Every structure is written in C-alpha cells, then in structure tokens.
Amino acid sequence: MPSYEARANVHKSAFAARVLKLVAAKKTNLCASLDVTTTKELIELADKVGPYVCMIKTHIDIIDDFTYAGTVLPLKELALKHGFFLFEDRKFADIGNTVKHQYKNGVYRIAEWSDITNAHGVPGTGIIAGLRAGAEETVSEQKKEDVSDYENSQYKEFLVPSPNEKLARGLLMLAELSCKGSLATGEYSKQTIELARSDPEFVVGFIAQNRPKGDSEDWLILTPGVGLDDKGDALGQQYRTVEDVMSTGTDIIIVGRGLYGQNRDPIEEAKRYQKAGWEAYQKINC
C-alpha cells in the first residue's frame, strides 16, 4: 500500500483524506475504544489517551449520566486539544428514514458531533441514503456556526472541513466483526462491499478484519479486536496482534480494554499501542 500521505493527496473523499493526513501528522494509527458508562470516565480517559490516538470510538448510549452539554461538549473540546476524530459506534441497522432521525435527532444528536459512524448492510442501500441525508441536513445547518473554537487548535487543518466539503462526515460499513461466531463473513461481506460502492463519497471504508482483495477503491479499513496481551474474553471477543492485522491491510487499529482494562495505565498502554501500530505500518511501507 502507498503511504498515508500519498493516499491522502489523491483520495476521492475529502473526509477520508483529512483522516489520513491526521494519522500521518501525529504518527498514530490507533483508535481508542472507550466503552465506559460514566461521563467522568469517558472524559478522563479521552484526555489521557488523546495525544496518542487519531480517533476515539464511543458508545454514547451506555453513558448513564449523559447530557449533551456535559458529555459531548467536553469531548469535542478534547478532540480539538489533542487532535482526534470522534467515532460513534452506533451500528445503525434500520430503514433509511428511521436511521436518518436516529443519526440526526433524539437525545444524542450523533450527526452534530460524531465525525464518523457505522452501519450494517442488512437494510440495503436505503440505510446509506438515509444516513447521508442526515449528514447533509446537519452539516447544512452547521454552516452558519462560528468556527472560532477551532482557531487555537494546532490540528485545525485536519479537523475542520473545507468550505466546499459538502458532507464533512464519514460512514463505515460493517463488513466483518471480531467476535466468535459472527455471521458477517463470506457472501455477506462481499455484498456489504458492493453496497458501499453506491456512495463512495460518504462511505469511506469498513470495519473489517482484512482489506478487500483486488478492490480498486481506496477504502479506510478499521479493525477491532486488536491486543498485545490478551487472546480473547468470556463473551466471544477474539484478539489479533497488531502486526497481524496490519499485514492484512488495516489502516487503523481499534483497541479498547487493552488500554485501560485490568488496572492498566491508559497513558502507558496508549503509547505502547501507538508505537506498535506505527512500527508495523513502517515495516509494510518501507
């Protein structure tokens, strides 16, 4: 694969290009998955690992004390401070009109703050169209927003969409999962990739264990289930090593409990995974 920088310079998606540029600038292909249940835990962990990641993945609906002002706004401030994209792991799976409102409206208003989200392919192309509509409507409403908040961020060029960037959001399709017994394999994975081709501007890539072979599109591949120590858990999660997933075409490794579970030091572990991910990338691209 070409380098992150080379891909960013020619990428069809302005959003994907910004992600690749940030990865290259920070020298980190690590996404921290912060599956915690309180705002305090989420914000504290995000602040600790923020300098070492390109992205933070959330499950915002498991936050017991969620409020938009108390949870989302501090998280957005940390994204600007440390330079990372926000990825709400919502796994949308309904018809187009429903997912549009799940994405844009309700308590969480995901489209307002989450740079990237994901969806199952089961409902067909309607789910992509619905989420795109939610993104376009939200971004259109935000065009009038004051961007002065970004002025003091050294990561402004990566995090702030250009004026002509119509979507300013990205969607990942769930092509493969890391849990034991997953049905997202084989023909299902192939059909999901075909669905993504219906809108390569908005669908920027996949949650997958491998890069699609022989595909001419430059998809972003994000891989969960990455661990340097553990092999799995009692609930079916299976872990692969950093070098293993990078060798099969991953762009960004997703690590959760490996950073903060079992009384681990999240700062030291984030540094460790950042180093491992970047070294594995350099081995492939040197």
From Swiss-Prot:
Its EC number is 4.1.1.23. Gene3D superfamilies: Aldolase class I (3.20.20.70). It holds the Pfam family OMPdecase. GO terms for molecular function: orotidine-5'-phosphate decarboxylase activity. Substrate binds at residues 35, 57-59, 89-98, 239, 257. It catalyses: orotidine 5'-phosphate + H(+) = UMP + CO2. One of its GO terms (biological process) is 'de novo' pyrimidine nucleobase biosynthetic process. Pathway: Pyrimidine metabolism; UMP biosynthesis via de novo pathway; UMP from orotate: step 2/2. The active site is at 91 (proton donor). Belongs to the OMP decarboxylase family. This is Orotidine 5'-phosphate decarboxylase. The lineage of its organism: Eukaryota, Fungi, Dikarya, Ascomycota, Saccharomycotina. The gene is URA3.
